[in-house]
Amino acid sequence: MTNSLFKQKLSPIKPGDPIDYKDVELLKKFITDRGKILPRRLTGLTAKQQRDLTTAVKRARIIALLPFVNPEG
């Protein structure tokens, strides 16, 4: 297997920018149509950004800004 299978994606979030759980439109970019959080190798985020993103998505789900699962999926 070569590294050509995965294209390097540029992160839409600049390093150092905060990831806010209230920014639902940004969080939706990192969630599949079934409601799962995309892995870091697909999002192009740094490890810290991916951890912050996961925390933000989970917080948004708990306060009902994002669904836990997609109703159509």
From Swiss-Prot:
GO terms for cellular component: cytosolic small ribosomal subunit. InterPro entries: Ribosomal_bS18, Ribosomal_bS18_CS, Ribosomal_bS18_sf. SUPFAM superfamilies: Ribosomal protein S18 (SSF46911). One of its GO terms (molecular function) is small ribosomal subunit rRNA binding. One of its GO terms (biological process) is translation. The keyword Ribonucleoprotein applies. Gene3D superfamilies: Ribosomal protein S18. The keyword rRNA-binding applies. Keywords: Ribonucleoprotein, Ribosomal protein, RNA-binding, rRNA-binding. Pfam families: Ribosomal_S18. Binds as a heterodimer with protein bS6 to the central domain of the 16S rRNA, where it helps stabilize the platform of the 30S subunit. Part of the 30S ribosomal subunit. Forms a tight heterodimer with protein bS6. Belongs to the bacterial ribosomal protein bS18 family. This is Small ribosomal subunit protein bS18. It comes from Prochlorococcus marinus (strain NATL2A).
